[in-house]
């Protein structure tokens, strides 16, 4: 398939994923509001931190998801269907083995940590244990769905992925409304309902794959070489996943130990928003990820690197467009969204947006690193650096700093990790620091300077209110689009985008 056809498919898949993201993010934000009202700050904080313990211990699944997508797309790039079928079965076998290991860890170390180290009110400890058990079951269902999701993504069937995800969030919304009508302990019921959603979603992904992809029919196959290759790739990615999990949930537990569940609730709400933003960028990266791997498998380095540069740049620009109104008017939006805004929520939200913008430049670099498969040195250096986030945050909190210091530390480490990824990639693929600086970083900095500086100056001139919000949000998006058009894209990229939108959305 030609690069032009691949680009069209990437655009189509990206649009499908963005439709999914807009619906999922909108519904999720509304769900957060309802759940916060129904559970209250303390119970919401308990759910957030208890589920976080499970995510922190069970970082294996994220690693295996990346490995599955990489190996499936690689075999499709090689056009080797028999090897793909064998790879799928071996991957499922590994998941079954990991599920046993994770279950043992959670029911021993995790349960001990919950009952002996977490800061949870004594009268809610029983409910917290129920939440823990249902969260384990939810996690296992989510993990078992990953091989099927990965196969759908490798085949670039993003519309199916989007439809099932939209169904999932719609079901969650219905069950949250049902939660308001039930009289039993709502924290326990909420955890149980989320398990039901995870279970049904798993069966939907499995059903579609078995109907459409013959490779998805599991049979026990032992291939020691393939098993070793997947585990070797996953092993070093696992180290990176551990660093990412500690970067997020490790800090969440630190905040619980120092400040209690109310601060966890504020951070949990901010991270619900952050997850939506991350999903926005990840959707774009998800659409290009199979192509990057297939280009690498086919030895087409020129198209691979060009795609990495473009996706890094456009990931940032798309996220900047979405987040500019929230950076300018976060206090007004949160007051409008929530009847009562928890302490620290505004500053958490603003700093998380900045962190997400920095991270957005790194996602395509990580995709390129995963495509070539040699992850040992990469993960030791980048993962080891990110692991320092939690102990450094602990030192600042121990010294008496406010909770938001953890966000400042996170932003610094995210920028440092991006620099290290770039430096390491130059030794793995034909990518240059000068090329990335010229094609990506320089254009991003010019766009940020020419769009956000005048916007923040404008906002500071007027009192907060509905009129300022409407003007700043509308003006912010328009100024950012103009800045991207003039300074962020090349002439050929601008012409291609203009031609595409004129074709899809004719005005005459």
How does the language model describe each region?
Residues 62-78, 154, 213-214, 270, ...:
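Helix-loop junctions and terminal segments of transmembrane helices
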Residues 2, 426-437, 453-508:
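Membrane-proximal transmembrane or re-entrant/amphipathic helices at the cytosolic face
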Residues 1-28, 82-90, 126-128, 220-241, ...:
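N-terminal membrane topogenesis motif
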Residues 1-10, 187-193, 205-248, 287, ...:
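Interhelical loop/hinge segments that connect adjacent transmembrane helices in multipass membrane
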Residues 35-56, 87, 187-192, 226-234, ...:
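Interfacial/gating helices of multi-pass transporter permease domains
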Residues 36-38, 42-43, 159, 170-203, ...:
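Membrane-interface helix-loop junctions in multi-pass transport and translocation proteins
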Residues 140-165, 177, 188, 353-384, ...:
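Membrane-interface junctions at transmembrane-helix termini in multi-pass inner-membrane proteins
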Residues 12-29, 193-205, 209, 224-294, ...:
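Transmembrane helical elements of multi-pass membrane transporters/channels
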């Amino acid at each position: 398939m030609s690069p032009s056809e691949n680009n069209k498919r990437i655009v189509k898949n990206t649009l499908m994923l963005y439709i999914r993201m807009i619906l999922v993010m909108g519904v999720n934000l509304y769900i957060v509001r309802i759940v916060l009202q129904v559970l209250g700050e303390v119970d919401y904080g308990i759910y957030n931190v208890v589920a976080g313990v499970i995510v922190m211990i069970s970082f294996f699944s994220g690693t295996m998801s990346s490995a599955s997508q990489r190996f499936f797309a690689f075999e499709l790039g090689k056009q080797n269907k028999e090897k793909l079928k064998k790879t799928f079965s071996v991957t499922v076998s590994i998941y079954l083995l990991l599920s046993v290991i994770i279950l043992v860890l959670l029911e021993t170390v995790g349960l001990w940590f919950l009952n002996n180290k977490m800061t949870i009110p004594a009268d809610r400890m029983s409910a917290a244990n129920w939440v823990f058990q249902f969260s384990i079951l939810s996690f296992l269902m989510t993990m078992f769905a990953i091989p099927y999701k990965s196969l759908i993504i490798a085949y670039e069937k993003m519309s199916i992925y989007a439809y099932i995800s939209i169904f999932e969030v719609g079901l969650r919304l219905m069950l949250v409304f049902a939660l308001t009508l039930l009289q039993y302990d709502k924290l326990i019921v909420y955890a149980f309902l989320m398990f039901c959603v995870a279970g049904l979603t798993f069966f939907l992904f499995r059903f579609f794959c078995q109907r459409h992809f013959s490779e998805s029919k599991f049979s026990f196959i032992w291939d020691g070489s393939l098993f070793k290759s997947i585990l070797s790739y996953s092993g070093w990615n696992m180290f990176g996943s551990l660093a990412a999990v500690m970067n997020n949930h490790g800090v969440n537990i630190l905040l619980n130990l120092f400040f209690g569940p109310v601060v966890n609730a504020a951070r949990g709400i901010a991270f619900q928003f952050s997850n939506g933003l991350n999903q926005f960028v990840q959707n774009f990266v998800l659409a290009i990820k199979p192509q990057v791997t297939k280009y690498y498998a086919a030895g087409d380095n020129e198209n691979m690197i060009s795609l990495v540069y473009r996706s890094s740049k456009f990931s940032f620009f798309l996220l900047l467009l979405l987040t500019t109104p929230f950076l300018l008017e976060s206090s007004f939006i949160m007051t409008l969204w929530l009847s009562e805004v928890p302490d620290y929520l505004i500053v958490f939200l603003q700093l998380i947006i900045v962190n997400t913008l920095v991270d957005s430049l790194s996602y395509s670099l990580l995709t390129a690193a995963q495509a070539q498969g040699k992850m040992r040195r990469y993960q030791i250096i980048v993962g080891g650096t990110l692991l320092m986030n939690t102990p450094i945050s602990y030192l600042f909190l121990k010294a008496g700093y406010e909770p938001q210091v953890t966000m400042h530390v996170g932003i610094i480490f995210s920028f440092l990790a991006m620099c290290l990824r770039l430096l390491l990639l130059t030794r793995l693929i034909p990518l240059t620091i000068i090329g990335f600086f010229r094609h990506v970083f320089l254009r991003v900095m010019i766009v940020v300077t020419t769009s956000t500086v005048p916007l923040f100056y404008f906002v500071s001139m007027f009192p907060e209110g509905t009129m300022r919000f409407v003007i700043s949000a509308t003006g912010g998006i328009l100024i950012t689009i103009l800045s991207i058009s003039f300074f962020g894209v090349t002439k050929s990229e601008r012409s291609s985008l203009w031609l595409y939108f004129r074709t899809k959305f004719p005005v005459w």
